[in-house]
């Protein structure tokens, strides 16, 4: 049960994001069970994304820092990828099976969850 705030850097085939603060980078490291951002792997992790308007959708992330960064004081060197159902990679424009498996895992985990006293209903089809 960890949560972090992210900055959306860019969108396209999938969403490129970065931790908003140094504390959020620490949380991301905890999610991956590592002590520093340089040790975070490309292993996919199922997540529940909650937007600023309260909309919740399941997604998958790989936390490995890569590419450009917008925020210089968050102790994170670059960005990481956030994938939704049927999102594609930038390089090959293909759906990543490992991200899709993590999303399905998130569905099975979240379909029986209550968060802040509210039963979460997970939709696997996004508008």
Outline where the language-model segments fall.
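Active-site acidic/histidine clusters and adjacent loop/turn architecture
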Residues: 2-5, 10-15
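Exported/periplasmic cell-wall-interacting domains
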Residues: 14-122
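Conserved small-residue-rich
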Residues: 1, 122-127
């Amino acid at each position: 049960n960890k949560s972090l705030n992210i900055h959306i850097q860019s969108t396209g085939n999938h969403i490129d994001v970065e931790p908003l603060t140094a504390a959020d980078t620490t949380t991301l490291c905890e999610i991956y069970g590592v002590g520093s951002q340089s040790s975070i792997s490309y292993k996919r992790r199922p997540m529940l994304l909650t937007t600023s308007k309260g909309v919740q959708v399941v997604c998958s992330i790989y936390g490995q820092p890569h590419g450009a960064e917008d925020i210089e004081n968050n102790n994170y060197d670059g960005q990481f990828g956030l994938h939704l159902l049927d999102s594609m990679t930038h390089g090959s424009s293909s759906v990543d099976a490992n991200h899709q498996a993590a999303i399905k895992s998130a569905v099975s985990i979240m379909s029986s969850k209550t968060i802040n006293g509210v039963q979460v209903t997970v939709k696997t089809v996004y508008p």
